[in-house]
Amino acid sequence: MIRCFAWTPLVGAPLITTVHFTSPPSLRIFASRSSAPSSSSSSSSTVAAASRRSISLSIIAVTSSVVSSFCFSSPALADFSEIPNSGGVKALDLRIGDGDVPIEGDQIEIHYYGRLAAKQGWRFDSTYDHKDSNGEAVPFTFVLGSSKVIPGIETAVRSMKVGGIRRVVIPPSQGYQNTSQEPLPPNFFDRQRLFTTIFNPTRLANGEGSTLGTLVFDIELVSTRRLHR
């Protein structure tokens, strides 16, 4: 089984491409029948073995070619930099902003696109889907330093400028620690799927805690406003 996922850079609401191979691509191989009779069963076995090797190599070649074309179409993890003193949050700036840098206590507005790595990049929420009465996307608002949101998002925006877009990989320790931390998907079934994956007791007992809650967020810093002068 081969699974890969590639994410496109954020332009408005970014797209996600997921590719699954539950079995290798099927190949049909035609062989001409020899007019001469087989000399021995040993010869037949040799030909059969060679055919099997040929099929295996062909499958590997085709599979590798297809996977390469999809899996490496997005920025590699090596392109990310770990944010200092972040607990392991890795960031890649897709666009550098030209506005203010937020400070503690500011009211922040962001657009985001959140995915869960343990579900092959399943998108669990996006503010681009949250519309007001005019059909405009409604940004997510919070106060920096209030501990209202998961630590990884606060860490990400602290070093951004307004107008910037940043992709961050958030390890479980900087992600959801309970089901009340924001941002929360407004859809009940999305919330349920998100938290039953992250806090799955069986998988946690199997030692998967270091990966289950890994999140990938594309964050656009829309605005920052000083609440206290």
UniProtKB/Swiss-Prot annotation:
What PANTHER family does this protein map onto?
PEPTIDYL-PROLYL CIS-TRANS ISOMERASE FKBP17-1, CHLOROPLASTIC
State the SUPFAM superfamilies in the record. Answer: FKBP-like (SSF54534)
What sort of enzyme, by top EC class, is this? isomerase
Kindly report the protein's main subcellular placement as a broad class: plastid
EC no. given is 5.2.1.8
Query: What keywords are assigned to this protein?
Result: Chloroplast, Isomerase, Plastid, Rotamase, Thylakoid, Transit peptide
Domain PPIase FKBP-type positions: 105-225
Q: Per the record's keyword annotation, is Lyase included, yes or no?
A: no
Q: What is this protein called?
A: Peptidyl-prolyl cis-trans isomerase FKBP17-1, chloroplastic
Database matches in InterPro entries: FKBP17-1-like, PPIase_dom_sf, PPIase_FKBP_dom
This chain's source organism reads Arabidopsis thaliana (Mouse-ear cress)
The family assignment reads: Belongs to the FKBP-type PPIase family.
PROSITE patterns reported for this sequence: FKBP_PPIASE (PS50059)
